[in-house]
Amino acid sequence: KCDLADPAVTARWIKYYEEKGFFVSPVNSKNGKGVRQVNDVIQSACKEKIERDRRRGILNRPIRAMIVGIPNVGKSTFINSFARKACTKTGNKPGVTKGKQWIRLNKNVELLDTPGILWPKFEDQTVGLRLAFIGSIKDELSNQYELCLLLLQYFKEYYPEAVPSAYQIDPADTEVELLKNVAKRRGCLKSGGEYDLDKAANYVIDDFRNGRLGCISLEQPENRLLL
């Protein structure tokens, strides 16, 4: 989902992993940008194996790879974009992919799709927060209002213009006041005219996850504990 991330931060992540010897290719599975380059990356990563097979007389055997990752990061959308057809069910929530399946992407690559996986326990609360922010942890398991305040706290320090610019509202001294401004702009009111901050919080979180607040990254290679 490079379309949702801060491009400057993404560039630093690419450099970070390439320096560690990884093959890296940022993609936007929605419009297909970068998806075709993944095939070249796979061929480069498996170059030695391909040459070894050829010396043994094994020709045109497809590379078998596995796609793994945490829930709700676009694995199935990437597969469908790569294969140019709807091979897997997608949805902007964790747990859509239920089981493993082999998918023939092209004559050169077969991919094993797998359900999203999470650590059984988070040693660092920051990791859990980031996963909750992007929807990799089910929303039912967290207080969305409190989660939104923490997200706004992060925005205030690292992307201060994101929320005021997206909603055309004034900045505020506190996260609660900023959320009230969002509620006012979006018409989130309870009976009696009180602001519905829970509803406003859901708007902010959903808009963040869908890129409507701009391109934002929650972590940088040079500072792994931003929050």
Show where each model-derived region lies.
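Glycine-rich phosphate-binding P-loop
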Residues: A65-R84, T88, T114
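Conserved active-site beta-strand-loop modules that form the wall/rim of enzyme catalytic pockets
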Residues: S29, I79, V109-L112
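Solvent-exposed alpha-helices and their adjacent loops that cap or buttress functional pockets
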Residues: I58-N60, F82, I103-R104
